[in-house]
């Protein structure tokens, strides 16, 4: 593809004078404790890995106010966005190994930076081939969530760096008739499997033909308690559903990752808004991850919109970033490059923002519980009061 637009942030910094830029960034990206989000120094080992292996690193720091009784709960979070590593016509195993080789170097950089919790993008170990509606060869990427090769690789890296790693994958559930699921496996810092979450909302729009392969999760909204904090995974399309975000928060999540695969024409104006809103209204940190690059497939497919058949999904625009409970957000990765985004956060900020805004105290859950109970009744009638003067 020809030269792509790198990022909104890079363009602002290139063309807006420094004084005005400071105010623009305050309004667009928010303040943390009265100032712009601070940068975090990147160690030389991580920089060398990035330069040698052609990926970018950004790092930031989100602080909480000091407290008298609670010590700071400092955790380093990492998110990785990546393109595929081989042509989609290559043998399946070659495609997987090419991606694994990329990811290993980026996890090495995360380890050098002392990342505690790392999340990869949606189905990181394969092309996002669900646009094709073809079952084979793409379902051959599906594997066991406990013994698959991608999980064994992630377990090895988790042990190596004492790191909790979330591995979003295409799961083959051998226990239940070999059904396929869009799953995120949570691997503990000892390399143990803590549990798994699945995609709650499956898109049926444009080229997102995912229900051809898997259906909605029945696991609910699990939150995983780790030595570094309470973690949840809201996979991709679930970010468009406010109640999905809410449920993870009510279950106690402090960090919610949103591993995604989404393209510019469909969702890019929404990308910088949804996760920040969720972080603020639910009082937790959010790591938003999107794959990057344009993936071309061997056979043409259509989008159901009357336009010509094509062989690519469109451009996955990356732009992975973190959102904070206080509604600031960190610098994002670019729209065009593989990358690692790191943010050092103080989890005490979650409670501090709850105490400030009182969203949970003022939420009126009973009001909405009754409304939703009424709404799902087949005989529900909307409460619409009509102007009597209307004819």
Swiss-Prot record:
GO:BP terms for this protein?
A: beta-alanine biosynthetic process via 3-ureidopropionate
In what pathway does it function?
Amino-acid biosynthesis; beta-alanine biosynthesis
**Catalytic reaction list:** 3-(carbamoylamino)propanoate + H2O + 2 H(+) = beta-alanine + NH4(+) + CO2; 3-(carbamoylamino)-2-methylpropanoate + H2O + 2 H(+) = (R)-3-amino-2-methylpropanoate + NH4(+) + CO2
Q: Which residues carry this modification: N-acetylserine?
A: 2
Can you provide one Gene Ontology molecular function annotated for this UniProt record?
Answer: beta-ureidopropionase activity
**Key words of the record:** Acetylation, Hydrolase
Q: CDD domains recorded for this chain?
A: ML_beta-AS (cd07587)
Q: Which InterPro entries match?
A: Aliph_Amidase/BUP (IPR050345), C-N_Hydrolase (IPR003010), C-N_Hydrolase_sf (IPR036526)
Q: Is Acetylation set as a keyword in this record?
A: yes
- EC numbers on record: 3.5.1.6
Cellular component (GO) terms are:
phagocytic vesicle
Q: Which Pfam families match?
A: CN_hydrolase (PF00795)
Q: Does the keyword Acetylation apply?
A: yes
Active-site residue numbers: 122, 199, 236
Question: What domain of life?
Answer: Eukaryota
Q: Where is the CN hydrolase domain?
A: 75-347
Q: What is the purpose of this protein?
A: Catalyzes a late step in pyrimidine degradation. Converts N-carbamoyl-beta-alanine (3-ureidopropanoate) into beta-alanine, ammonia and carbon dioxide. Likewise, converts N-carbamoyl-beta-aminoisobutyrate (3-ureidoisobutyrate) into beta-aminoisobutyrate, ammonia and carbon dioxide.
Per UniProt, subunit arrangement is: Homodimer and higher homooligomers.
**The protein's name:** Beta-ureidopropionase
Give the species this sequence originates from.
Dictyostelium discoideum
Lineage, opening ranks: Eukaryota, Amoebozoa, Evosea, Eumycetozoa, Dictyostelia
